[in-house]
């Protein structure tokens, strides 16, 4: 019985077979790609509803339909969820948004609303609001009328710092039945506050220092006695003095009050 060794396929034929197989798979993949692209572009995949959930107290569905939905690009399969998230987060009163696909052909959008705690002003810019994180955001100020929000102001980008200072001062003010109405940090670093009763207080450059806090408490304690003594309300007080404070009464100017010296006190950090 004879046996035959398998014939070796010539190199040119092997190359032709390999090329044919490669071309076949390329054509097959191309057809699949074209078919997939065609399927994804059909209106079968159009987004048919957007479900809003979360904190919607200040977020109007009308605003969402008018401003957000026209900016969404793609269908259920092709929409870029990160880009859609940015669209929703650009809406007034929206702090964060989470966008997810929801079968069949829907988007679920979970919104977290901004929580305003103050009105913010900085040089050269329109008034904004400040949220609980100290971030300034733009919204219709008319929507917060009646909330009694304090007004804060300072250099650009300092909203968080000014809000933090306001929160430090408020408990001390409340001890003396006062409430912060405005707090401002000037370009030179000095701070001033006005209470809802109309009292203006110049706090100097370190309002949270122990020395300033002590002088503020001393003044608040003496304020009723001073007003009773002079028969007038106090308009303003300057706490930038190392050993006391200076007050201004309605219609009366006082030279300065210093408990340790008869001479007119100088603002802290200043020499005669």
Swiss-Prot record:
It comes from the Bacteria. Gene3D superfamilies: Cell division protein FtsQ/DivIB (3.40.50.11690), membrane protein fhac (3.10.20.310). Keywords: Cell cycle, Cell division, Cell inner membrane, Cell membrane, Membrane, Transmembrane, Transmembrane helix. Residues 41-272 are periplasmic. Its main location: membrane. One of its GO terms (biological process) is FtsZ-dependent cytokinesis. GO terms for cellular component: cell division site; plasma membrane. It is found in: Cell inner membrane. It is a single-pass type II membrane protein. InterPro entries: Cell_div_FtsQ/DivIB_C (IPR005548), FtsQ (IPR026579), FtsQ_C_sf (IPR045335), POTRA (IPR034746), POTRA_FtsQ_type (IPR013685). The keyword Membrane applies. Pfam families: FtsQ_DivIB_C, POTRA_1. Essential cell division protein. May link together the upstream cell division proteins, which are predominantly cytoplasmic, with the downstream cell division proteins, which are predominantly periplasmic. May control correct divisome assembly. Part of a complex composed of FtsB, FtsL and FtsQ. This is Cell division protein FtsQ. It comes from Thiomonas arsenitoxydans (strain DSM 22701 / CIP 110005 / 3As).
């Amino acid at each position: 019985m004879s046996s035959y060794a398998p014939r070796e396929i010539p190199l040119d034929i092997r190359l032709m077979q390999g090329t044919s197989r490669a071309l076949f798979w390329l054509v097959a993949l191309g057809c699949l790609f074209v078919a997939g692209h065609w399927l994804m572009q059909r209106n079968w995949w159009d987004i048919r509803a957007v479900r809003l959930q979360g904190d919607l107290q200040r977020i109007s569905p009308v605003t969402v339909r008018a401003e957000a939905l026209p900016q969404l690009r793609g269908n259920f399969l092709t929409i870029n969820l990160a880009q859609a998230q940015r669209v929703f987060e650009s809406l007034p009163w929206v702090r964060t948004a989470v966008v997810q696909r929801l079968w069949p052909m829907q988007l679920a959008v979970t919104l977290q609303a901004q929580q305003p705690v103050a009105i913010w002003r900085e040089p050269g810019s329109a008034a904004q609001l400040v949220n609980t994180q100290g971030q300034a955001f733009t919204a219709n100020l008319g929507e917060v009328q009646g909330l009694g929000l304090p007004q804060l102001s300072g250099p650009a980008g300092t909203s968080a710092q000014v809000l933090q200072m306001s929160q430090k001062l408020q408990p001390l003010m409340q001890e003396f039945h006062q409430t912060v109405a405005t707090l401002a940090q000037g370009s030179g670093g000095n701070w001033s506050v006005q209470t809802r009763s109309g009292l203006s207080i110049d706090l100097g450059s370190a309002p949270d220092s122990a020395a300033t806090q002590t002088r503020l408490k001393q003044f608040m304690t003496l304020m009723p006695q001073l007003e009773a003594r002079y028969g007038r309300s106090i308009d303003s007080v300057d706490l930038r003095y190392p050993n006391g404070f200076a007050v201004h009464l309605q219609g009366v100017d006082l030279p300065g009050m210093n408990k340790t010296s008869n001479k007119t006190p100088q603002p802290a950090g200043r020499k005669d």
